[in-house]
Regions:
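Walker B catalytic acidic pair
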Residues: 141-142
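Conserved PLP-binding active-site segment of the aspartate aminotransferase-like
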Residues: 187, 266-272, 289-311
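Conserved glycine-rich beta-strand-loop-beta hairpin in the small C-terminal domain of fold type I
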Residues: 232-242, 254-268, 278-280
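Structural signature of PLP-dependent enzymes
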Residues: 196-199, 220-242
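Short, small-residue-biased leader/transition segments that mark boundaries at the very start
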Residues: 2-6
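Conserved core of the PLP fold type I
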Residues: 7-135, 146, 152-160, 164-167, ...
Length: 311
């Protein structure tokens, strides 16, 4: 009880950082020191800390399409942010080079909204790019990694990074509930030392009580059990939604683009109607879908007739 009334260091309470390190070791194959882990109230807060740590003189590039909020946060922190187009393997390394970027913000395990899982060869290409200059880093947002429905999760880029070029970010908001604003990042050792040297005046934005509660939830095995239950639950929901779609459309009318991970997939209609018209007609039937083009930072010339299904 007394510990909960004591203000801990800015990175978060030791017990939670140790629990996270143990979880990452068993679940993601990552060997990290608890002192490399920084806990914060949401990934948005951590993105802001990263800009302060890495500097506003860098060019930050983000995936296009992708979460628009990420670029908005960088820009609000006075950092130059450029969208970089993706191909079928993920963000284009050649376009990152053309943008003269120093920081690449990516979601290689399960990209939103395309669902692309970056193959190993592209991951090594990104690491090679980062290793070409001392001021280059990869921010690996491990979005939705807990919810891989088949097989083992693909190891993160950090697990193959031998030169301290990857900053790993994840959150408990997706795996537990959005009202739990607890996220964390894993910094390379030299950046963690720099963080505590320059930014240790920041207080941890997560309450001590919540940190100790989550630490016990993880260390006593409840988090792993919860994830396993949720995988089964969402796996059943996924199959139910897929069965409904296949029962309503032929393969020519509607193609399902799915991935083994994440809580969404994409359907593509064989139609000449504008995406907006399709959205409006479906909404009249009580079905709310978003076209994938809503998530493009640079507006595409043509509609893709692809829509996101969340479940």
């Amino acid at each position: 009880q007394r510990q909960m009334c004591i203000r801990d260091r800015c990175g978060g309470v030791r017990e939670l950082r140790e629990a996270i390190a143990s979880h990452l070791s068993s679940f993601r194959g990552m060997n990290v020191d608890p002192d490399q882990i920084i806990v914060g109230a949401g990934t948005e807060y951590l993105y802001g800390l990263l800009v302060k740590l890495l500097g506003t003189d860098k060019v930050y590039c983000v995936e296009d399409p992708g979460y628009k909020k990420i670029s908005q946060i960088y820009e609000c922190n006075n950092a130059k942010c450029l969208p970089v187009q993706m191909d079928e393997q993920g963000i284009s390394v050649e376009l990152i080079k053309k943008a003269n970027a120093q920081i690449a913000h990516i979601s290689p395990t399960h990209h939103f909204p395309t669902g692309i899982t970056m193959p190993v060869n592209r991951r090594y290409e990104l690491l090679a790019w980062a290793n070409e200059s001392s001021d280059r880093y990869i921010i690996e947002d491990d979005y939705d990694s807990e919810f891989r429905m088949n097989g083992h999760p693909i190891p993160p880029i950090l697990s193959i990074d031998a030169c301290e070029k990857v900053i790993y970010i994840n959150t408990f908001s997706k795996s537990l509930t959005s009202t739990i604003r607890i996220s964390y990042m894993v910094l390379p050792e030299h950046l963690a030392n720099e963080f505590y040297r320059r930014l240790s005046f920041y207080s941890c934005t997560v309450s001590t009580f919540e940190q100790y509660t989550l630490a016990r939830f993880i260390s006593e095995g409840y988090f792993e059990k919860h994830i396993n239950r949720m995988r089964l639950h969402y796996g059943r929901k996924r199959q139910s939604v897929l069965s409904s779609i296949k029962g309503c459309f032929t393969e020519k009318e509607c193609r399902v683009i799915e991935n083994d991970s994440g809580l969404h997939f994409i359907i593509q209609f064989d139609t000449n109607l504008p995406d907006k018209t399709v959205e409006e007609r479906l909404l009249k039937k009580g079905i709310k879908l978003q076209a994938i083009t809503h998530f493009n930072l640079i507006k595409p010339k043509e509609d893709r007739h692809q829509f996101i299904i969340n479940y």
